[in-house]
């Protein structure tokens, strides 16, 4: 029991809902970049509607290999439970929303993304700026899995990372697991889009896990 209480004490949850940020400005506490510096770096601004504030990536640069990222400055972790609400707004090339973790720099990180144009959810490693989809545990390399990702509506994407095992969830349903050990060091977490995706994000929730978690 003492060990369990210690573990719970070592786990912390925080939710970034952007309610204290200024509309029309980038959110505080984030850094912005783009993989391999291909295309425009992205325009991440806080927006507001009747339901409250949210973060939007608003730059519609259609460069296909363009991957804008927004990462939290003050959180570095190895094992995380990471989720976000997202809403694809527009994009002729892509309508993508992603979560990144163990982010070392703009060219090296893990990524899971949902795409409303492809209707699938795929987990990748980005290593040296090269994006590679990873095989699903027990299924092989299938390019993720099909999922109905609605455009213009809010959905929830989640990944649970424990050591070299990653569990992927979409709208509360578990989709698959992936095992990979490319990045084992702690890194930052954040958000990701692709090409001309204009995407809204809200309620970025991060639970950091105790190092001794089984």
Language model features by range: what are they?
Residues 25-57, 62-66:
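Extracellular glycan-recognition surfaces and repeat-rich motifs
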Residues 11-35, 213-214:
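Extracellular carbohydrate-recognition regions
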Residues 153-167:
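Localized edge beta-strand/strand-to-loop motifs within extracellular or lumenal beta-rich domains
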Residues 15-17, 183-214:
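Ligand-recognition surfaces built from glycine- and aromatic
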């Amino acid at each position: 029991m003492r060990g369990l209480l210690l573990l719970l004490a070592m786990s912390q949850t925080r939710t970034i809902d952007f309610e204290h940020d200024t509309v029309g400005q980038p959110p505080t506490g984030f850094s912005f970049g783009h993989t391999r510096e291909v295309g425009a770096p992205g325009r991440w601004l806080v927006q507001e509607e009747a339901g409250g504030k949210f973060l939007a990536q608003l730059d519609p640069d259609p460069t296909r290999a363009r991957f804008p990222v927004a990462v939290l400055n003050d959180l570095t972790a190895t094992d995380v439970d990471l989720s976000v609400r997202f809403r694809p707004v527009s994009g002729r090339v892509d309508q993508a929303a992603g979560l990144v973790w163990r982010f070392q720099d703009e060219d090296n990180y893990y990524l899971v993304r949902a795409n409303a144009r492809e209707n699938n959810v795929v987990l990748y490693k980005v290593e040296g700026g090269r994006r590679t989809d990873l095989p699903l545990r027990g299924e092989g390399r299938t390019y993720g899995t099909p999922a109905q990702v609605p455009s213009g509506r809010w959905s929830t994407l989640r990944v649970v990372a424990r050591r070299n095992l990653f569990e992927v969830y979409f709208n509360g349903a578990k989709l698959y697991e992936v095992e990979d050990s490319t990045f084992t060091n702690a890194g930052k977490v954040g958000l990701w889009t692709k090409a001309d995706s204009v995407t809204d994000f809200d309620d970025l929730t991060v639970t950091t896990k105790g190092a001794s978690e089984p």
